[in-house]
Amino acid sequence: MTFRWQTDWFQDCMPLFSCLLEEAERIAAGKTGDFGKMGDLLGEIENICDPVEELKNCHYAGQMMNVRSALLDLTQTDQKAELASYTLLPFLWELREEIYFWGCVAEDIEKRQVYWQEEFVSHHRRVNPRRIEQKKVTIFIPACNHLEYTKQCVESVLRHTDLRECELLLLDHGSKDETAAYFHTIPNAKVIRFRENVGMLMFSVAFRACCGQYLAFVSNDTIVTEGWLSHLLDCLEREENALSATPVTPFTSNCQGIAPCPLEGLDEFAKDFYEKRKGNWRHRARIMPVIGVYDVEKLDAMGFGDRWFQTMEFWDDDVSLRARRKGFRQFLCTDVYCHHFGSVTGGVAWGHTLAAGRELFLQKHGVDAWGQGFCRSEDMMALLPEMELPETSISFLAVDCGIGDSIFEVQNYLKEQGKQVQTYALSEVEGYRGDVFPFVQGWHTAVEGTAAALTNAFAERRFSLILTEKSGLSGEILAERLLPGGYVLAMDSELTKYLRLAGRKGHWSLWQKM
């Protein structure tokens, strides 16, 4: 692992961290560690870092407190090797990374971009010495206060999960109530205790600590239902290049939710929900995972949570973008229903941090997280069943559909109808290429403009369906690119002169070539 942007003071920290990590790894291996020496090393790091102005507005101080508290806990437990493995080592790795990123990288735009391109993944890989304890799934439940909700969540996981192949990590993320004491009553659970809440670092600690082939994140304001984990794993194991699988939950945006079911009938509702929709898995451009199961090997290839998103808003949009550009797919499993109370932990501060998180996303990626195509329209979805496409092989053209959620939902629908789909896409914005190209058979950047590109791109092809989120396109050109009987599904468009109106819903309309 390299640290390209080391300052003089950070170089002074590096040998101290090497000694700390060496001692921690000795303890994790079941050997005796020198706790006094480790405390002294932390003191030396504090002497170097405390005056650094760039570290005043990050989680350096909080994470230093977490490391010191973990060290104290180690002196008071008989389970030293285990605690060092899943708490002290991940805490130290995150402390070092917090100091490096905010102290040496974050202030400079060029350094940030190089860091994200060349260092982020290697700096966030899982480095876990507990190889003898491999499990299929690590389930992690973070909680910051709200013990009454946390108990319902944990009890539902214990009730509805076969834990013989699972590791259960319970993260007390700076709670001031009795959360930590409750967590310690759960048999066979591993409790990671943050004395200080350190935002996004919590996700990285959980990832570094896990020993499962899959990592299941369960928010403490949810209740899981019978079969939740096996059903989500079924999707991950069957779908090609699947990074994550997420259930339907109420009080969730991004067209991922439905109206809540009364808790008294939750289990029966979820069982019936699954039987009626079994295997209905929808590839989506972005996912908001109040519950999400991830393929750990793929997370290792792209990194998980990014500390850049200090407000904890848009971190999931960031993960989704990086997944798309790796060619990994995220699935909303519309056959799995779990309950969500609705951002019990995060809801209070949400209004204050949303705009800040969106700006951080723009600064990192140069595109708006809520830009064109970030979430498909319910009106568009309502028009899809109005199409009559008798052919089994569908040639599909997407025109200026941005991030691509509408593209993926049309693909989902056509595949549900038993169609073989060949998808082509064109856009005036080259920046969307990485979001869409891995999932289509052809891409064209319309540097000549969309109207001209509709004439020139994929010139040898005619299409059964054209989808466009760009208004004002020529109906004549669109009709020319259609096969007889083909459709245009368009937003804010009037194509009456050249095509027959087959349906209209809100801003969307469906047109057919006769």
Whereabouts are the PLM-identified features?
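N-proximal low-complexity "stem/linker" segments adjacent to membrane-targeting elements
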Residues: 100-156
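A conserved acidic beta->alpha catalytic loop
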Residues: 172-180, 402-403
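Conserved donor nucleotide-binding strand/loop of the catalytic core
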Residues: 180-199, 209
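A recurrent flexible, glycine/aromatic-enriched loop bordering the glycosyltransferase active site
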Residues: 200-201, 208, 251-252, 256, ...
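Short aromatic/hydrophobic "clamp" motif used to bind/position activated sugar donors
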Residues: 215
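Conserved donor NDP-sugar-binding/catalytic core segment of glycosyltransferases
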Residues: 226-261
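A short, conserved alpha-helix in the catalytic core of glycosyltransferases
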Residues: 227-231, 285-303, 308-336
